[in-house]
Each structure stands twice: as structure tokens, then as C-alpha cells.
Amino acid sequence: MRPSKRAADAMRDVTLERAVARYAEGSCLVTFGNTRVLCTASLEERGPPWLRGSGKGWVTAEYAMLPRATHERTRREVNSGKPSGRTQEIQRLIGRSLRAVTNLPALGERQITVDCDVIQADGGTRTASITGAWVALHDCFAWMRARSIISVDPLKDHVAAVSCGIYKGQPVLDLDYAEDSAAETDANFVVTGKGGIVEVQGTAEMEPFSEAQFIELLALAKGGIANLVELQRKAIA
């Protein structure tokens, strides 16, 4: 039995609330159960230096947790002088995931920065961030098109992410903190709306997992992401 009493293939309640930040070109408050992340997409009228003269744009991401997003207060990373290795890994993952479904030349030489700020963490902050970031990016592009900054939608597809793991010997979908902290295996899957795999992160915390178990986790993830993509579609309708 899962601590949340969910079925093995059941996700937490997921919500995607748009236009929650007044000044951002695109924004989304995403919740996966008790995990809450504010995603904002901001337009900069210049791209990174290494793309100057290429005609291509760029999409990047930054990730942070509020000090009291966790059970005990964590120190703001800005006070330590640089982001932690975990933070750098997650924000690079978010950026890669968004670029995988973006036609960068359609942006022109501009950059979109998507900020993902965790308000409350209960497992799955990176997967919630990717799922909500896509909605914020979608709305940023819609804002740009409405003002004739770009002529076509740069988004090629949806992208969403979900965690899976093996908890007490059973493959389960969308781990919360209680499950994640005790799981034998923890994995994150990033998948497009058409079913293309963008990234897989998987770790055996205790015993190695088998190929058959990995296939089970992948099947759970694809089912969960199909539901997330449908929620994205409804959110932007």
C-alpha cells in the first residue's frame, strides 16, 4: 500500500493555472498534489552571445526553491554564491526539455528564460516544473504572436514529465516525498505529446532494477504523461 493510498498507476491531483503573474509574458502555477511550482516565461530581445548572427533563438531555464518550500528552512542559494549541483542539473533538464519541442529559428535572435520557483516541495519538483514550464512557454509565444513579434508558433509539440519508482517492490507512478525517500528505484521521464522520449533519469537506490522493471516504469510514465498532456491541452484551450 502506498502512503497516499493511491493505485500504482494513479497520479496525484494535478492542476495548471495560467496567467498567475501579472508582468510575465507567460506564467503557470502547477501543482502535483502538495508540490507547487510557479513557472514564468520572460522574453529578452537578444539571444545568447554564441548565437549572435545565426538567426536562431534560445530557450533556457532557471530553478529555485523558496527557503520554506521544505519541512525545514533551507538557505537561499544566492547567499552561497552559486547554485548547487542539484539546482544546475534540474534547470539544465528543464531547458533541454523545452528546447526539444521548440523551433528555435522561428524565435529569431531572442531568448526566453523560464523561471521555475518551487513554493512547496513534496516530491517531483523537476517533473512538475517541466510540465508547468511548457504552459508558461506556450503563453509567452502566444503573447509574442499577438504583438507580431513572431509570425508562427515556435512550439512543435507538448512536453511533460513524471516520476516513477519501485516502492516496496512495486512499480508506482508519480512519487511524493514519502515514497521518493524510501523507494528502491527512482526515475524521471520526459516525453513529448507524440510519445518521443526526451530524457530518462533512473537510479537504483538499493538493489539494481531489471530490464523488465524498467519497461514497467516506462509504461507507467507514458500513461501518466498522456494524462498530463491532455491537462495541458485543456489548460490552453
From Swiss-Prot:
Tell me one GO molecular function of this protein: tRNA nucleotidyltransferase activity
**Protein EC:** 2.7.7.56
- Name the UniProt record assigns to this protein: Ribonuclease PH
Q: What does this protein do?
A: Phosphorolytic 3'-5' exoribonuclease that plays an important role in tRNA 3'-end maturation. Removes nucleotide residues following the 3'-CCA terminus of tRNAs; can also add nucleotides to the ends of RNA molecules by using nucleoside diphosphates as substrates, but this may not be physiologically important. Probably plays a role in initiation of 16S rRNA degradation (leading to ribosome degradation) during starvation.
Which family does this protein fall into?
A: Belongs to the RNase PH family.
| Parts of the chain that traverse the membrane | none
Which top EC class is given?
transferase
The family database entries (SUPFAM superfamilies) matched by this protein are listed as: Ribonuclease PH domain 2-like (SSF55666), Ribosomal protein S5 domain 2-like (SSF54211)
The biological processes this protein is annotated with in GO are:
rRNA catabolic process; rRNA processing; tRNA processing
Q: What binding partners and quaternary form does the record give? A: Homohexameric ring arranged as a trimer of dimers.
Catalyzes what? Answer: tRNA(n+1) + phosphate = tRNA(n) + a ribonucleoside 5'-diphosphate
- In its UniProt entry, the species of origin is given as Methylorubrum populi (strain ATCC BAA-705 / NCIMB 13946 / BJ001) (Methylobacterium populi)
Q: Where does phosphate bind?
A: 86, 124-126
Name of the gene encoding the protein in the UniProt record = rph
| Record key words, sorted | Nucleotidyltransferase, RNA-binding, rRNA processing, Transferase, tRNA processing, tRNA-binding
